[in-house]
Amino acid sequence: MNPDTDSPIMPLFIILGKLTDKAVQKMRDAKERDEKAEEIIQAAGGRLISHYYTFGRYDFVATVELPSAEILASVIIDITRWGTVGTETMTALLPEDIYKMAH
């Protein structure tokens, strides 16, 4: 349960992303792309929890809540269609969920 709302928490996903050359060449458009991606997530019934640009193997990391893995796939397809990012995703579980499973 979400302690702030007493509602069930949606599945949590971590998105690791790499920017394409097209995205790097148009970094001035990054804010607009990020806002559009958040709109897509929200329209799918989800929530962007965090988003960071990173240095190293991946160019950005985002954490999102979405109703299902199928909806995540749809969101990723919509976003990668722009040709500006490639992604790798992971399902994330809260420590409390793991503790419950261990009993």
Where are these regions (language model features)?
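A compositional/biophysical signature of low hydrophobicity enriched in polar/charged and small residues
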Residues: 2-103
